[in-house]
């Protein structure tokens, strides 16, 4: 039986030197003070140098990744999870290009907006500023090391990274390349700090450091997210599982529905914006479900359905409550026939994870109602769930897809990694003048 990655499980592969997460976080905070005042030009130049460093260190990064992938296969990890772990030249190029994209985006730090003059004479505005130090806890996706570093850096934040045990060597190699670029530009390397251990105690200590860290962002499986949410003494933005639905309405173009089904389920099933459940209106189920089954069978997808689905598709396995709540991350799909739009919306309300939802319909009022009613950070009409991605939505590299409504919801780009402070200009105005 395949094992699941446990990012917070203790392992023996740690650095030989004594480790103080508190000291690393303190250094990270000191670096954040410098980052907050860096010019946009310096940040962009450093990001481009980071991208170049990743490509220059490709051989070392791939060698380190090979160690992690070999160990993961020996441990019997799921193919879907190994897919997230694997790096290759193309993926390294994409990591580098994502950093260059971030460099090309407008710098939100220092932006002033909404300035108004008050009756007292003062001028009140808001300035966008960095959050400070962001703690990232994530599983076997070494690309997150570069993506998180780049986005946090451009937004003026330092980042303390604790990657998954299974990506230990890969993350170290990626971070080493980034440090080369930081040092070359005279930026404190502590701005991007990777905790060099796989010991669970490091995560537990990290979650208590509210004197140094301003925000925790966990990315990974349900167990990791729950552990962080229940343990952290620092505010958490959860990047929860993606139980994404495709609803084929009675007025749907069924050829479009076929395309979105295949792209959403088959193109890369191991990612959080892949489809996990198919909902089909009863009025088109007799026509669409046999067509969908043929396509899914050809793609090697296992279909599990409710009673109506199984009546239409003999041989399909029964879907359970657990199936409808599952983030499979593999070639398995749950299906259900619904009698109305309300039934589809109710199903999503019960089993969805506030991530990504898709409707296929040619009827505009139905589309508008679905968009307004469904509780998800990204809602798509006649477009693939795979577009629920920071790059595709115009954010550049994303730090993740938040399913927490405060302080960000959906794919998190640069602006989501900043906040605002009030800035007031006056000419000596006082609220309660006192006679001298």
UniProtKB/Swiss-Prot annotation:
Pathway: Amino-acid biosynthesis; L-proline biosynthesis; L-glutamate 5-semialdehyde from L-glutamate: step 2/2. One of its GO terms (molecular function) is glutamate-5-semialdehyde dehydrogenase activity. GO terms for biological process: L-proline biosynthetic process. GO terms for cellular component: cytoplasm. Keywords: Amino-acid biosynthesis, Cytoplasm, NADP, Oxidoreductase, Proline biosynthesis. It is found in: Cytoplasm. Its EC number is 1.2.1.41. It catalyses: L-glutamate 5-semialdehyde + phosphate + NADP(+) = L-glutamyl 5-phosphate + NADPH + H(+). It comes from the Bacteria. CDD domains: ALDH_F18-19_ProA-GPR (cd07079). Belongs to the gamma-glutamyl phosphate reductase family. NCBIfam families: PRK00197.1, proA. Catalyzes the NADPH-dependent reduction of L-glutamate 5-phosphate into L-glutamate 5-semialdehyde and phosphate. The product spontaneously undergoes cyclization to form 1-pyrroline-5-carboxylate. This is Gamma-glutamyl phosphate reductase.
């Amino acid at each position: 039986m395949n094992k699941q990655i446990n990012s917070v499980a203790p392992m023996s592969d740690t650095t030989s030197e004594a480790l103080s997460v508190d000291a690393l976080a303190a250094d990270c905070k000191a670096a954040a003070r410098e980052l907050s005042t860096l010019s946009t030009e310096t940040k962009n130049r450093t990001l481009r140098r980071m991208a170049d460093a990743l490509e220059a260190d490709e051989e070392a990064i791939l060698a380190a990744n090979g160690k992690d992938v070999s160990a993961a296969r020996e441990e019997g990890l799921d193919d879907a999870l190994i897919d997230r772990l694997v790096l290759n030249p193309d993926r390294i190029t994409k990591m580098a290009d994502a950093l260059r994209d971030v460099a090309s985006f407008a710098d939100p730090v220092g932006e002033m907006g909404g300035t108004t003059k008050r009756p007292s004479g003062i001028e009140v505005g808001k300035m966008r500023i960095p959050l400070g130090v962001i703690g990232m806890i994530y599983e076997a996706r070494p690309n997150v090391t570069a993506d998180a570093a780049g986005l946090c850096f451009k937004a003026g934040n330092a980042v303390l990274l604790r990657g998954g045990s299974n990506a230990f060597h890969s993350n170290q190699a990626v971070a080493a390349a980034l440090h080369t670029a930081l040092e070359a530009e005279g930026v404190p390397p502590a701005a991007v700090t990777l905790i060099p251990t796989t010991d669970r105690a490091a995560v537990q200590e990290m979650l208590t450091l509210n004197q140094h860290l301003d925000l925790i962002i966990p990315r990974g499986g349900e167990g990791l997210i729950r552990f962080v949410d229940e343990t952290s003494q620092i505010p958490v933005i959860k990047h929860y599982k993606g139980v994404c639905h495709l609803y084929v309405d009675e007025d749907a173009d069924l050829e479009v529905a076929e395309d979105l089904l295949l792209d959403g389920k088959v193109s890369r099933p191991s990612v959080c914006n892949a489809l996990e459940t198919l909902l089909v209106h009863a009025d088109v189920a007799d026509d669409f479900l046999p067509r969908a089954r043929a396509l899914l069978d050809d793609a090697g997808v296992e279909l599990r359905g409710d009673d109506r689905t199984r009546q239409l598709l003999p041989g399909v396995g029964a879907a359970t409550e657990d199936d409808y709540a599952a983030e499979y991350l593999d070639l398995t799909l749950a299906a259900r026939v619904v009698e109305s739009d309300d039934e589809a919306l109710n199903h999503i309300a019960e089993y969805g994870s506030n991530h990504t939802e898709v409707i296929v319909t040619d009827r505009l009022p139905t589309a508008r109602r679905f968009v307004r009613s469904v509780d998800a950070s990204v809602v798509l009409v006649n477009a693939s769930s795979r577009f629920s991605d920071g790059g595709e939505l115009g954010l550049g590299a994303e730090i993740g897809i938040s399913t927490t409504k405060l302080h960000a919801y959906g794919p998190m780009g640069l602006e989501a990694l900043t906040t605002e402070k009030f800035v007031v200009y006056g000419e000596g105005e006082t609220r309660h003048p006192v006679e001298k």
